[in-house]
Each structure stands twice: as structure tokens, then as C-alpha cells.
């Protein structure tokens, strides 16, 4: 999401400020991937000690008419519009392929994409896994996005690892496979 927003901001000549309460020491020393690409597109990053949900509430009350606040992970109802388009494209593709059944998997941070995709594609099964937090966290996020809908993606529990921080066990396995 960060990189996509940085591209849109650059294209539209908008200012893009990214608030976070943590940046791994690895990313601070050597920004790479989406972070480096977003910074290169002009994204400003602000490290804050304030909890992000409290900061978002404060920022939301002081927004000017030409400003937009996007929650971490896009966890807000406006995200459903884009997912409706994605669902239509998936539905069209499935019809072209003559698929009556389809299982869709996507990893989740806040679970927003998986939730709205399952809501839009009730005829298919959407699977997700918790990349941060727990399966219970994802269910809480789903409830916050739409308290009236109980159509949730199927959550496949997962161990999670801190973003941009190498996990020694996985890195060792990667090295062994690379040799």
C-alpha cells in the first residue's frame, strides 16, 4: 500500500506523509524494497511515539478539505470500492476459465483486502493468514470494518514475524536452499 500511494502521490503531485511508530534498525540503516522506492518517490516518513490509532483519531479531526487520511493497511470502508473492482475482474476471469469454484488466498496485515474480497465474492472461498497479530486480531478487524457482516474469509493461522527484521531460522533455511 505504501508504494502504491507514493506512486499516486508523485503522479498527482501530492504530498505523502507516512506516520509510523516503529522502523526496524535494519530499515533505518539500509532502506530497501518498497520503503526505499517510496522514499525515492518523495514520501516523507515521520516516526512518532504516539499510538497510531490515537494519532489517526487526532489527525482525522484536524483534516483540511484537501487532505485524506488512510489508516494503516487501508483498514477503512473506502477500501471496499477498489476491492469491488478487483472482485469483478476475478469473477470475469473465473467465468472465462469456466471455473465454477475458486479458492483465493492472500496474506493479511489488517485483513481489509481479504475481508472485502470475501464480502464481494460470496460464491468463492477466500483464505487468508495473519502476517501480523493473531487470527483473533483479524476477526476484530473484520468486525470493525463492517459490524453487520459475518461473512469472513477463512483464516489459516500462521506464525508471524516482525516486518523488515530477518528471522534467523528462516534466513538459515534460505541459505541452505540457496547453496
Model-derived features: where do they sit?
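Catalytic phosphate/metal-binding cores of nucleic-acid and nucleotide-processing enzymes, i.e., regions
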Residues: 1, 12, 84-89, 93-99, ...
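Short glycine/serine/threonine-rich phosphate/pyrophosphate-binding segments
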Residues: 1-5, 109-117
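Active-site-proximal loop->helix
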Residues: 3-50, 119, 136-149
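Short beta-strand/turn micro-motifs composed of small residues
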Residues: 20-22, 106-108, 128-130
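Small/polar-residue-rich loop-to-helix segments that shape phosphate-bearing ligand pockets
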Residues: 22-97, 154-178
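Structural motif
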Residues: 68, 103-104
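Active-site/ligand-binding loops adjacent to catalytic centers
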Residues: 124-179
